[in-house]
């Protein structure tokens, strides 16, 4: 932190990942939150120091299964309350589920609704597997080209992009 800030990046946001794959579900209980609360800027403030969390919705939170077994509402509600209490912010930098699986369309949208309810604490989210992933990858969010236009997968349309507050 010191080297980054001393290099002149005083107004830039810096993401602070935790341990245990920076899991939002374990961020408080595994000590990540407590440890990262001690990280400060040169002036002792925590301005622009953002916690970086991940959370998938499959059975083992690995992001390797097409179906979703949880909506993580409890995890993100608890973390959102903790962030508010401690006047801190986080960003969900990895999340996702099966791109057209009905269980994931429901669960991912519900998860992101909670992040919107705590929009003062959560800066946003990033869907995992958007970009140059092979279309055969289980959680691919890569659009398909149809003639001159592109078609997003349902998960992106309904949840990942669809839940951004306007």
Could you tell me what each predicted segment is?
Residues 20, 126-134:
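Short, solvent-exposed turn/loop segments enriched in Gly/Ser/Thr/Pro and often Arg
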Residues 137:
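Substrate-binding cleft and catalytic face of glycoside hydrolase catalytic domains
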Residues 1-123, 140-159:
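Extracellular glycoside hydrolase catalytic/binding regions
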Residues 159-166:
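C-terminal helix/juxtamembrane-tail motif
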């Amino acid at each position: 932190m010191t080297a980054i800030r001393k290099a002149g990046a005083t107004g830039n946001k810096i993401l602070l990942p935790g341990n245990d794959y920076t899991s939002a579900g374990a961020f408080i209980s595994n000590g990540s939150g407590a440890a990262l609360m001690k990280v400060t800027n040169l002036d002792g403030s925590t301005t622009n120091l953002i916690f970086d969390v991940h959370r998938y919705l499959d059975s083992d939170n690995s992001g390797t299964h097409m179906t979703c077994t949880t909506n993580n509402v409890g995890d993100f509600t608890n973390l959102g309350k903790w962030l508010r209490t401690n006047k801190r912010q986080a960003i969900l930098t990895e999340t996702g589920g099966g791109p057209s699986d009905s269980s994931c369309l429901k669960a991912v949208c519900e998860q992101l609704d909670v992040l919107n309810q705590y929009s003062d604490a959560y800066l946003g989210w990033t869907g995992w597997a958007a970009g140059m992933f092979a279309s055969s990858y289980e959680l691919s969010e890569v659009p398909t080209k149809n003639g001159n236009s592109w078609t997003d997968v349902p998960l992106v349309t309904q949840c990942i992009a669809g839940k951004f507050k306007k």
